[in-house]
Design a protein with these regions (language model features):
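N-terminal, intrinsically disordered, low-complexity segments
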Residues: 6-10
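Short, small-residue-biased leader/transition segments that mark boundaries at the very start
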Residues: 1-5
Length: 168
């Protein structure tokens, strides 16, 4: 199923580590390529958070985080050790994973809070008709949060790779 979605989003498969960029133009091209990859995989992450299967989004997000980091490294022609020597990446991965896992919980809490406000402000009959929309609101919030954190993780990693290259 993921292959079908991956094909629809036209996500580039990065098979081999490239050479190090030697000019600013090559660096700019690598950034564009990496940012496109991060955007598409972030969309995939947000899509997984919409599916109402417990822990599915968490498993997909863990795989996507690993894939994004490995693919961005390959795009820039770097290996894991070169990038990790710059900062404490493991701590950031754990925090990102926790944030993404929490996105579904936050979405539910936002939905519950919205439901309480509507019930207080609108007659019970009207509120009862509107409650059917709240699961969708929670899923939309969850998807937005998941996209944001996955995108942030990818962009931060792109910046780290560029710092490493500029320091070489």
């Amino acid at each position: 199923r993921q292959m079908c979605i991956r094909d629809r989003l036209n996500i580039e498969e990065i098979k081999e580590k490239g050479d190090l960029p030697t000019t600013q133009e090559e660096l700019r091209q690598r950034r564009e390529r990496a940012e496109t990859l991060v955007k598409k995989k972030s969309l995939l992450s947000s899509g997984a958070s919409i599916v109402p299967i417990p822990a599915l989004d968490f498993g997909v997000d863990l795989k996507l985080m690993r894939d994004i980091i490995e693919d961005v490294n390959k795009i820039y022609g770097l290996d894991h050790d070169q990038v990790n020597s710059l900062s404490d990446q493991v701590k950031e991965r754990i925090m990102s994973a926790a944030a993404i896992q929490g996105s579904q919980f936050i979405g539910r809490k936002v939905s519950e809070a919205l439901l309480k406000v509507v019930i207080k402000d609108v007659a019970k009959r009207a509120a009862a008709k509107q409650t059917k929309w709240f699961p969708f609101v929670g899923q939309a919030v969850s998807a937005s949060i998941s996209y944001y954190f996955m995108s942030k993780l990818g962009k931060d990693h792109i910046n780290k790779c560029e710092k490493v290259i500029n320091n070489l």
